Amino acid sequence: MKNIALIINDLKGNGAERVVITLSESFIALGHSATIICFNDFIELPVNKKINVLSFNINRWRWIPRSLRGRVVSYFLDRFILRKIGAPDLILSNLLPVDRIMCESKLSNVNLVVHNTMSSEYKFNLDLIENFKHSEVFKIYSKKPVICVSQGVADDFKSLFPLHEGCNQIYNPINADLIKTYANECDVPYKNYIVHVGKFKREKRHDVLIKAYAKAEIDKLLVLVGQGALESEYKALVSQLNLTGKVIFAGFHSNPYPLIKNADLLVLSSDFEGLPTVLLESLSLSTPAISSDCPSGPREILPSNNLFPQDNIDKLAEFLSVPDYSIYKTELPDKFYADTIAKKHLTKA
């Protein structure tokens, strides 16, 4: 039996957090021990009772200068891990706030999981690669092996770290059976609708989706599932385009699967992604899905006929205007199933 630790800031309802839970469930199903360690006691998502969830309060070290904090906190985190679960056979560190600490860890087999295209997320200009080499991000991700969640993320990483020898690509997992169970847990108050699931962040490009929806003039609701800093801005845009009552701001749902299952179509309109879990969830529920052909991930999940040019309102409006969304229906590829992905991670333990 392998002892696996997955470390993340919290368990809010975002893609990386869902992936950590799914991976933990898969490790346990295969007969191994999985522990999730969070830096904050913020849990919005349902967590299997078989998963050991521990809290490591990072806030007590906020007073330490940032230049020293990583080394100091990693020392105490290493001791915390050894005391609570013993020496892990595999450690998966997720997202920059955690990677900033775990890159300094003295424990063995620490892997930093890269969930997004760094050149897009951190706005790095590859023409200024020498400047990038002096950045904090470069220093963090040069210190440990990394696991990239899609081939697009891996290609982007290698362009930024051409000399890094520890870059591996393993897809994010999807537990299709569990998602189908969750999808039947409650009724949906909407009918005849298109759905988007994601935080109201600039890179998700809700503005493109809302404008394309207005241009398409279709007799369907647009249901936006999520929350975030830009929500008020997008509500103002909806009002400006006279779409009040047609665009529904449904808020955050810890279980969005009934809304995905009962939708006529799921849309992703992002400027960039890592491996968009929501597309995998949509396919597992047999809901047609379309996406911007953004870097990276969508083209590794969907056929080309389901991809529209990034930041193209007119083309997205065309996709929304087709009379039958079943043309966008596609099967979930086997390579994304959770047990397959968990076994790939275990080869590194």
Which ranges hold each PLM region?
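N-terminal strand-loop element at the rim of the active site
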Residues: 6-14, 18-22, 26-68, 153
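A charged, aromatic-enriched C-terminal amphipathic alpha-helix characteristic of glycosyltransferases
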Residues: 15, 325-349
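A conserved mid-protein helix/loop that constitutes part of the nucleotide-sugar donor-binding site
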Residues: 17-22, 192, 196-215, 229-235
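Membrane-proximal helix-turn-helix segments that form the acceptor-binding/catalytic region
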Residues: 80-81, 128-147
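Short His-centered aromatic/hydrophobic patch
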Residues: 92-99, 114
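A short, active-site helix/loop in glycosyltransferases that binds the activated sugar's phosphate group
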Residues: 101, 142-167, 174-176
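Aromatic "clamp/platform" in nucleotide-sugar-dependent glycosyltransferases that forms part
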Residues: 252, 271
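Conserved acidic donor-binding segment of nucleotide-sugar-dependent glycosyltransferases
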Residues: 303-314, 321-324
